[in-house]
Amino acid sequence: MHDIKQPQGIIYIIRKEECNMKKGMTILYKVHNNLYVNLTNRCPCACTFCLRQNMDTVTHDDQTLWLEHEPTVEEVKAEFAKIDLSEYEEVVFCGYGEPTERLDALLEIAKFVKENYQKPIRINTNGLANLIWKKDVTPELKGLVDTISISLNTPNADRYHELVRSKFGDQSFDAMLS
């Protein structure tokens, strides 16, 4: 296991290639009554509590959530075609990476789901999309995403920085709150 160090305020994030986790192509997976969409392994954070640091999977059927490659929009649509969405309450963008890292794909898939399945859509996020894209992305989500769940994790910036270890450093906490 690699240690994460912070010399001179620089954050080093463990890369998937440095870990010994198995990879697969679990694009869609079920949690309770919801269908989850796993779009990427990329994340601007290295949270000390994140399951992906130590586990291949969080699903009951033991399928890995580490992706061999980022699925294309067409691959995701093909996965949707294989299942009956009537048994799910909502579609949730959440996997082993930050879903807004692939904002264009997320938006295209959300539009596809809205047009074809009329299911509520939620994004589970670290809340740093505006830093990732260097712009306010919230207008792009309007009409496509019904709920955004932001992982707050701590009540203050110092503790947040200590636990979340965002590559954006000190600006992350305030950006996540805005």
Residue ranges and their predicted role:
Residues D3-I4:
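Short hydrophobic alpha-helical segments enriched in small aliphatic residues
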Residues G9-N20:
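Short, Lys/Arg-enriched N-terminal segments with co-localized hydrophobic residues
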